Amino acid sequence: MLKVTLICSDKNHPVFRWLHKWKVENEHNYIINLLTCIADITSEGDLLFLVSCSEIVTKKHRDMFQQCLVLHASDLPKNRGWSPHVWSILNGENDITLSLLEAEDKVDMGRIWKKAKIKLNGTELYDEINQKLFEGELQLISWACKNLSCVTPTQQDSSAANY
């Protein structure tokens, strides 16, 4: 059975309860750990997902997993850095792109596994934006678990990067 670890740095972050729900719904398919800190990793696994994780995962910890993946709310390589979807919305964009990428030493620089677009109609409130965002993140997590053995990641074009 696939061994999946999810890390969200703060139990009070709104996405944490969504991750817990995903864990409960998928425990019959995978062995799942939901943690708040890299130091809490006690064993190797297949997939490590970093969702609203404020820590940079060292190579030592990344090497404990077949893949270490980050969920990032921007159309990478554009809008690297923390919480870019907030700035996209404030700038009047009507959608959020979620990028699923490999974790590296440098933040948001890894190869891209998959992207997903979330449409906004412009009337959503905070909780409604979060719901769409978190549902999209969970879909990407499920997709990665099902497609681990057949993914061909693509390199980011660093010349198009901004922060």
Language-model segment annotations:
Residues M1-Y163:
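One-carbon transfer enzymes
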